[in-house]
Amino acid sequence: MRATEVLLSEKPFIHEETVLKNTQLGSFTEVGMSNFIENSVLDDYSYTGQFCFIQNTTIGKFSNIAAMVRIGPTDHPYERPSLHHFTYRSKMYGFSDQDDMPFFEQRESQIAKIGHDTWIGHGAIIQPGVTIGNGAIVGSGAIVTKDVPPYAIVELVI
């Protein structure tokens, strides 16, 4: 379906092959094809392009998120002897009856915040816990590791 054929309404429009886990969508929102969104909020009148991967994030109203954007990528435990996920997914490997839940809770607590009326360009990456201020623009391919003030324009690696 072409974007010009979509008619938005109070009910969010979710394109095919999208996975939503513990996520709230506002009115007149559109979620692009093949997105994965987890532990997040997409407020009214905001949209995502195709192939976005968003975790642990709140997104304000009228936000424009281009294709292939990554927000809130989860980290590996670099303070441990190994970076491999067997150290916190020990149940998966048969090492324990349970996974390292405090590690997962700590990951989920690092909320990325995207303000109202923002534009996140194609292929941008926004790290966990970063705030993008209202009206800010994040250029295509930018890697954002620290907060962006309202109405700022950022490009490349900052």
Report the location of each language-model feature.
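Alpha/beta-hydrolase-fold catalytic nucleophile elbow
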Residues: A66, G139, E155
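Conserved functional loop/turn residues at catalytic and ligand-binding sites
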Residues: T58, K146-D147
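Short-chain dehydrogenase/reductase
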Residues: W119, I137, I153-V154
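Flexible glycine-rich beta->alpha loop in the catalytic core of nucleotide-sugar glycosyltransferases
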Residues: H76, A142-I143, P149
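Catalytic binding pocket for nucleotide-activated donors in carbohydrate/polymer assembly enzymes
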Residues: V148-I158
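Conserved sequence/active-site signature of Rossmann-fold short-chain dehydrogenase/reductase
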Residues: R70-I71, I143, I153
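A generic "structured core" feature
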Residues: G133, I137-G139, I143
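Flexible, glycine/small-residue-enriched loop-and-beta-strand segment within the central core
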Residues: R2, L7-V130, I158
